UniProtKB/Swiss-Prot annotation:
The active site is at S185, D385, H447. Residues 559-568 have a biased composition (Gly residues). Its EC number is 3.4.16.6. Residues 471-502, 556-643 are annotated as: Disordered. It is found in: Golgi apparatus, trans-Golgi network membrane. The gene is KEX1. This is Pheromone-processing carboxypeptidase KEX1. The chain crosses the membrane at residues 520-540. The lineage of its organism: Eukaryota, Fungi, Dikarya, Ascomycota, Pezizomycotina. One of its GO terms (cellular component) is membrane. Residues 31-519 are lumenal. Glycans are attached at N436, N444. Belongs to the peptidase S10 family.
């Protein structure tokens, strides 16, 4: 006779057995219970006095099989103008965090020091919800197994659409917003690819339409050939290099090598022989400073100099505060950063950039004509940027054919005029537009235009989105094109918080939110019912066993043993597979993180420029260390040794 468990033994093992029986359902329950409230940021260390901007932050899984999670930081709009809008912002790299945009460019706060935030006058969340995403996986606070970094642009875009679908399920009240993608530098590749996938998704049967209304790309890396050829032209026009000089002759030789490579090679996002042009400009124009240190031009703002070979990677000055702030334990906890992410925040992750090698991807310039047939696009450029300079952008526009014409030609021999832009009485730049494409040049601006001119870029954004402030009041800014005031926009504060239309919009959004919560509650009830049924079945079998059903008792002992073993197994696995490093903990955080431009230092061909990237080691300050570029990583050759 097979003995049955004593009554005391049965109840002693009951918690373990019940846990084993219900563990799969518990995992599902936990996922179902994840709601917008779990991402709500209740407080933000160092925030200025007064009401906190409503925000949510955290991770969304995009590739469960490789622990791929994208981090987001969402700020709600301060006012609703005539409609709801959402702007998704991406920085470049590849591998540079969009927290650059959040804390140094268009977010509601900027850092006064590494502990104190202050309001950003000109933040983009005045009339639009703004969503910052560390993209692709591995960038900033995002993470992924170290053998699963993204390599191609389509792969990146596919993962981003997954992120958006899951994000809208959490926040359904935003799914019907007018949607805009914005970013800078290497985001000039990201944004068109994401837009292509969003437009394709909208054409699929049974999908909710996302109201993609426009793209904004600042100092974008879009068409490599035009940008490579513009380096030397820009250097001549800015007086960095004198025409006819020995330096000019050497650079012209490298340009011809590049042109030959472009003529025989396939269209690609990067061409190593052409990358050397920028590297050579920085090397050959370096000079000795007052302290006898070798100095070079800042490739992101040629009005400035930097110690060679950094050439701009110590810029902007706000970087000195951003990394310490985002590594604070209380900040990490406030933003719901997964504690399993074992490395601290870095501006530009060199591992992401080194693995992102889109050899199968075409440059995004190939996508723009089709996108322009459906969606307005705005390209804007800071006039003092070298690495993704405005001359290259103007060349790609002139050569591109879209919507029945080429470039800004309105008719044979007639081009769209460049309209002088003044902002609050100052010359701000110029605007040019035709057939769904708008181009804006910002005078006295760097690679990171919003860093230099937050108010002007907010005015640009509001005009592009068609913001109408008549419904909310506020003093319109004095912004003119050729002396004429256009639609009224406002930069700074507004007179009031809205009208009946705004209240109706808020009521509609609230209803959508509660509907999502109701659906989540129904799912939870179903899961609890299933778990209860499993427990009831277990109790029924135990009672039958104690009544002496020998065969059943024998089977029950085997089943119980299997369940107990399963419980032990679950403790060591995740999702039915062995747990792997969320993000390789053996990564050497003393290495300098880089962008896409390899350092021009002699003997350091594997290092990369990373627009303003800083070392992961706060104490690493040695001259000659590798570095990279915050917007677009570019491969460069060797640099001459310092004399």
């Amino acid at each position: 006779m097979v003995p049955s468990w004593p009554s005391t033994g049965c109840w002693r093992h009951l918690p373990v057995v019940l846990a084993a029986l219900t563990l799969p359902w518990t995992a599902t329950l936990a996922a179902a219970e994840k709601s917008a409230g779990d991402y709500f940021v209740h407080s933000l260390p160092g925030a200025p006095e007064g009401p906190l901007v409503k925000m949510h932050a955290g991770h969304i899984e995009v590739t469960p099989e490789t622990n791929g999670n994208l981090f987001f930081w969402h700020f709600q709009n301060k006012h609703i103008a005539n409609k709801q809008r959402t702007v998704i912002w991406l920085n470049g790299g590849p591998g540079c965090s969009s927290e650059d945009g959040a804390l140094m460019e268009i977010g509601p706060y900027r850092l006064k020091d590494d502990k104190t935030l202050m309001y950003n006058d000109g933040a983009w969340n005045e009339f639009a919800n703004v969503l910052f995403v560390d993209n692709p996986v591995g960038t900033g606070f995002s993470y992924v197994d170290t053998n699963a970094y993204v390599r191609e642009l389509d792969e990146m875009a596919e993962q981003f659409v997954i992120f958006m679908e899951k994000w809208y399920k959490l926040f359904p009240e935003y799914e019907h917003d007018d949607l805009y993608f914005a970013g800078e530098s290497y985001a000039g590749q990201y944004i068109p690819y994401i837009a292509k996938h969003v437009l394709a998704r909208n054409k699929e049967a049974g999908t909710k339409q996302w109201n993609l209304k426009g793209l904004l790309i600042g100092n974008g890396w879009i068409s490599p050939p035009e940008q490579y050829e513009a380096y030397l032209q820009f250097a001549f026009e800015k007086g960095l290099v004198k025409k006819g000089s020995d330096i000019a002759s050497k650079l012209e030789v490298q340009l011809r090598i590049c042109q030959k490579d472009l003529a025989v090679g396939e269209s690609a996002v990067d061409h190593p022989e052409c990358e050397k042009i920028l590297q050579e400009i920085l090397k050959l124009t370096a000079t000795r400073g007052k302290d006898n240190k070798l100095e070079c031009y800042n490739m992101y703002d040629v009005r400035l100099k930097d110690v060679y070979p950094s050439c701009g990677m110590n810029w902007p000055s706000d970087l000195a505060n951003v990394q310490p702030y985002l590594r604070r334990k209380d900040v990490v906890q406030a933003l719901h950063v997964n504690p399993n992410k074992v490395t601290g925040w870095v501006e530009c992750d060199g591992r992401v950039g080194q693995n992102f090698n889109p050899v199968k991807s075409k440059p995004s310039i190939d996508l723009l004509p089709d996108i322009l047939s459906e969606v307005p696009v705005m390209l804007f450029s800071g006039a003092e940027d070298l690495i993704c300079n405005h001359l290259g952008t103007e060349a790609l526009i002139s050569r591109m054919a879209w919507n029945g014409g080429r470039g800004f030609e309105l008719s044979p021999g007639t081009w769209a005029p460049r309209r002088d832009w003044t902002f609050e009485g100052e010359d701000a730049g110029f605007w040019q537009e035709a057939r769904n494409l708008t181009y804006v040049v910002f005078y006295n601006a760097s690679h990171m235009v919003p860093y230099d001119h937050p108010r002007r870029t907010r005015d640009m954004l509001d005009r592009f989105m068609g913001v109408d402030i008549s419904s909310i009041g506020g003093d319109p800014t004095d912004s003119r094109l050729d002396g004429e005031k256009g639609p009224e926009t406002t930069v700074g504060g507004t007179a009031g918080n809205g009208n009946a239309d705004q209240e109706a919009e808020k009521a509609k959004l609230s209803a959508a939110k509660w509907e999502a919560y109701r659906r989540s509650g129904e799912i939870v009830l179903v899961i609890v019912a299933v778990a209860a049924a499993a427990w009831g079945y277990f109790v029924w079998r135990e009672r039958r066993k104690r009544r002496g059903y020998q065969g059943l008792a024998s089977a029950e002992n085997g089943a119980a043993g299997g369940v107990m073993g399963g419980n032990s197994g679950f403790r060591n696995t995740h999702g039915g597979r062995p747990r792997s490093d969320v993000e390789a903990g053996d990564f050497d955080e003393t290495q300098l993180d880089s962008l896409h431009v390899r350092s021009p230092v002699e003997g350091q061909e594997d290092a990369r420029y990373s627009l303003g990237a800083v070392s992961d080691d706060d104490d690493e300050e040695e001259e000659g260390s590798a570095a990279g570029a915050k917007g677009k990583e570019k491969e460069t050759g060797k640099a001459a040794e310092s004399s």
